[in-house]
Design a protein with these regions (language model features):
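Compositionally biased, proline/threonine/alanine/serine-rich low-complexity intrinsically disordered stretches
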Residues: 15-18, 22-23, 67, 161-171
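Bacterial N-terminal signal peptides that target proteins for export
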Residues: 1-8
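Residue-level signal for secondary-structure boundary elements
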Residues: 40, 77-81, 162
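Alpha-helix boundary/capping and short turn/kink residues
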Residues: 41-44, 114
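Short, low-complexity N-terminal intrinsically disordered segments enriched in polar/charged residues
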Residues: 11-12, 17-41
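Exposed beta-sheet edge and beta->alpha loop/turn motif
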Residues: 92-171
């Protein structure tokens, strides 16, 4: 094999790996967007399907989580608030630990409140147990204290973003 052929094969292999990584980050972002859309539209059954199973279990199961989400939404409406939407960005990296993959996806949530629109930045933790074919999600709000309990194998090189104060955009 010539030097030129070897270089070409290496270049092709690198391009394939980069394309695979790009499609993986896009796949996890697209599923995270479906997760956010389910929250915004009140499709709590779909939201529970996309939630990391241990979280669903800790809340008391599928039906209890759906009921908790429904009641929370009704309470928000009673106080003049509603979730307007959530935008999720691609993860910076996907880290593999054993058979699992992890990623952190930045997220911005907009909530209508009586005084205007509240914009809050946060993140989702994405977990795949089938090499990136499917993903489930954990809302990062208030998770730092319980991370070891929920995901004891969470990779330390993935640093959780700092919590930021919500910003009110007045009417």
């Amino acid at each position: 094999m010539t030097y030129r052929t070897s270089l070409m094969l290496i270049a092709i292999a690198v391009c394939v790996q980069l394309a695979s990584a790009d499609s993986q980050t896009e796949r996890v972002r697209a599923l995270a967007a479906k997760n956010s859309a389910a929250l915004s539209s009140g499709n709590y059954a779909r939201l529970v399907e996309l939630t990391y199973p241990k979280i669903v279990e800790m809340i008391g199961g599928r039906d209890k989580m759906i009921e908790t989400l429904r009641r929370g939404s009704e309470d928000m409406k009673a106080h003049g608030s509603a979730i307007l939407g959530a935008e999720v960005s691609e993860p910076k990296e996907v880290v593999t630990v054993g058979d699992r993959q992890f990623a952190i996806l930045p997220m911005t949530v907009r909530v209508r409140v009586p005084d205007g629109t509240l914009r809050s930045t946060g993140f989702l933790i994405a977990v795949s147990e089938d090499h990136g074919k499917t993903w489930t999600f954990i809302d990062g709000a208030g998770l730092k204290e319980k991370l070891a309990q929920v995901l004891p194998e969470f990779p330390p090189q993935l640093l959780l973003p700092p919590r930021e104060q919500p910003v009110l955009e007045p009417k």
